């Protein structure tokens, strides 16, 4: 087994002191992380890490594709695919690993075209953000991409899935995304990815009136 030790100390703060490799596969590895809490007590944590990280800004990209067409409501493009760890179909943003020497923006456009067939333009790219920090150290860039639906190449897009990838492209209206996610999840017994659902919630709250503050009596 592989163990990495740290000799640094930081009183009053959390500090990882060692990471012991338990098992490793092609894509992920399982480690026992030993750390010190602010009181000086040593604790352990079971951690999953990707084996593909090589000094990149993040492991992957998650793409928020917004389809814009003349005389149509804006739509969000999602992909439905079977996820073995969940044992069910999931509704997600297009996503994938960043390849060596590739920028997050280039990776986002590549993954979007491969998984949905659409070609777009990057509107914004987030810094690296964590995916599931209680379980793994996986990080991603969230990249918003606009798609010109009037462009001839985007009228009948053809996905280019890789080996073993079986996806269904789903377009949902942006102005009613949360309601449509709930309905689709119930009808097709789908599990909606947390990032997609959080985006739907954010859109709903952004377009609704502010939460009312309870009247204070003196």
From Swiss-Prot:
Residues with PTM Phosphoserine: 10
Tissue: Widely expressed. Most abundant in liver.
N6-acetyllysine modified-residue sites: 209, 217
Residues engaged in binding Mg(2+) 3: 111, 115, 165
Reported cofactor(s): Mg(2+)
GO biological process: ATP generation from poly-ADP-D-ribose; chromatin remodeling; D-ribose catabolic process; nucleobase-containing compound metabolic process; ribonucleoside diphosphate catabolic process
Modified residues (N-acetylmethionine): 1
Positions with a binding annotation for Mg(2+) 1: 95, 115
InterPro entries assigned to the protein according to its UniProt record, in alphabetical order: Nudix_hydrolase, NUDIX_hydrolase-like_dom_sf, NUDIX_hydrolase_CS, NUDIX_hydrolase_dom
Chain segments annotated as coiled-coil in the UniProt record: none
UniProt motif (Nudix box) ranges: 96-117
Assembly description: Homodimer. Interacts with PARG.
Purpose of the protein: Enzyme that can either act as an ADP-sugar pyrophosphatase in absence of diphosphate or catalyze the synthesis of ATP in presence of diphosphate. In absence of diphosphate, hydrolyzes with similar activities various modified nucleoside diphosphates such as ADP-ribose, ADP-mannose, ADP-glucose, 8-oxo-GDP and 8-oxo-dGDP. Can also hydrolyze other nucleotide sugars with low activity. In presence of diphosphate, mediates the synthesis of ATP in the nucleus by catalyzing the conversion of ADP-ribose to ATP and ribose 5-phosphate. Nuclear ATP synthesis takes place when dephosphorylated at Thr-44.
Family stated for the protein in its record: Belongs to the Nudix hydrolase family.
Official protein name in the record: ADP-sugar pyrophosphatase
Organism: Mus musculus
Gene from which the chain derives: Nudt5
């Amino acid at each position: 087994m592989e163990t990495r030790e740290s000799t640094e100390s930081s009183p009053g703060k959390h500090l990882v002191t060692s990471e012991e490799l338990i098992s490793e596969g092609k894509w992920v590895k399982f480690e026992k992380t030993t750390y010190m809490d602010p009181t000086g007590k040593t604790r352990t944590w079971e951690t999953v890490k990707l084996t593909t990280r090589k000094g990149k800004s993040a492991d992957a990209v998650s793409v928020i594709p917004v389809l814009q067409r003349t005389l149509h409501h804006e739509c969000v493009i999602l992909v439905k695919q079977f996820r073995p760890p969940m044992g069910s179909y999931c509704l997600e943003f297009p996503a994938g690993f960043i390849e060596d020497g590739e920028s997050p923006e280039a990776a986002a456009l590549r993954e979007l075209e491969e998984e949905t067939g659409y070609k777009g333009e990057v509107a914004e790219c987030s810094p690296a953000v964590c995916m599931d920090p209680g379980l793994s150290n996986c990080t991603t860039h969230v990249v918003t991409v606009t798609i010109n639906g009037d462009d001839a190449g985007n009228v009948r897009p053809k996905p280019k899935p890789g080996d073993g990838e079986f996806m269904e492209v789903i377009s949902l209206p942006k102005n009613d995304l949360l309601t449509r996610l709930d309905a689709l999840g119930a009808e097709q017994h789908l599990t909606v990815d947390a990032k997609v659902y959080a985006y739907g919630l954010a859109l709903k709250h952004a377009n609704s009136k502010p939460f009312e503050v309870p009247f204070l009596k003196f």
